Amino acid sequence: MARYIGPTCKLARREGADLSLKSPARALDSKCKLEQKPGQHGASRKGKLSDYATQLREKQKVKRIYGLLERQFRNYYKKASTKKGNTGENLLQLLETRLDNVCYRMGFAVTRPAARQLVSHRCVLVNGKSVNLASYQIKAGDAITLSEKAQKQLRVQEALTVAEQHDMTPSWVEVDSKKFSGVFKAVPDRADLPSDINEALIVELYSK
């Protein structure tokens, strides 16, 4: 599956926001000017965006945060729109309950791409069974454990240390770093999710 492998700073500048594509222990380089768009004329690009452009940029930002392609993201939106409740909130909850994202939230990896790699390399067990599908949907009460091989990896050990140092573990997961395991306690409410995401703009875009 196609994945972006270019400079993460370029993506962050394009969206004007930190997309959590780098470890919290390595802040975005001072050269990564988020207020300046990438490209030769980035510094001179000014002016108010149209409603459509604003909606599009918000969708692109969220896609890049979770590392999804357009087809994947649209499928999540379609699924969210068929569920009861607020479509935008449903969308974020579906994204947050992906296995790769839960591993990231538990601190097993410093970024979502790194968490996805752990999953694809069969380093993650859900309720005792190996799962290598990053999009696997986690349910309340599911137990996540890293394989013995993954537990020995320095990058995993460092990731857990970074998560503890930066207090990154959200309230809806419980982690035992010594056992390299965690429990997904509950699907997060909207109030528990990032406030810098305006999911209503995405709903408006796809509703057209």
Curated annotation (Swiss-Prot):
Residues 97-160 form the S4 RNA-binding domain. Signal peptide: none annotated. InterPro entries: Ribosomal_uS4, Ribosomal_uS4_bac-type, Ribosomal_uS4_CS, Ribosomal_uS4_N, S4_RNA-bd, S4_RNA-bd_sf. GO terms for biological process: ribosomal small subunit biogenesis; translation. One of its GO terms (molecular function) is structural constituent of ribosome. The keyword Ribonucleoprotein applies. The keyword rRNA-binding applies. Keywords: Ribonucleoprotein, Ribosomal protein, RNA-binding, rRNA-binding. GO terms for cellular component: small ribosomal subunit. One of the primary rRNA binding proteins, it binds directly to 16S rRNA where it nucleates assembly of the body of the 30S subunit. PANTHER family: 30S 40S RIBOSOMAL PROTEIN (PTHR11831), SMALL RIBOSOMAL SUBUNIT PROTEIN US4M (PTHR11831:SF4). Part of the 30S ribosomal subunit. Contacts protein S5. The interaction surface between S4 and S5 is involved in control of translational fidelity. Belongs to the universal ribosomal protein uS4 family. This is Small ribosomal subunit protein uS4. It comes from Xanthomonas oryzae pv. oryzae (strain KACC10331 / KXO85).
